[in-house]
């Protein structure tokens, strides 16, 4: 099996119903898997990381109506921390089935209430990213998928 298949098998083997726990585990496994790559070629990693950060910053700067983060799980929280570190203020969060009205004083909007054409950072693992892709196409959102950024941070 190639490395990615081993990674997927490893994740599937330990999948639990608690989504936050699973997201945290996924992030940890991705980073552990990626760490070997980073240690082999650290200069390539630095270049890769800086390029991703440049993409994220440019995406945020391109939105006149503000940027939304799709997901309030581990990836969404990490994305918010990263953006706050850079001084970027988001417009809010998007959830498929919100359980709260806000997170850290940012509104959490239901997907059905989102206007077409918004700038959205999809902050979820690859599997969940696939599950929301149809909605993203329907709403014609300007989207940045960042699950790869969290493979190695």
Enumerate the predicted regions with their spans.
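C-terminal "capping" alpha-helix adjacent to the active site of nucleotide-linked donor transferases
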Residues: 1
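Hydrophobic, well-ordered beta-alpha structural blocks that scaffold small-molecule cofactor pockets
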Residues: 4-153
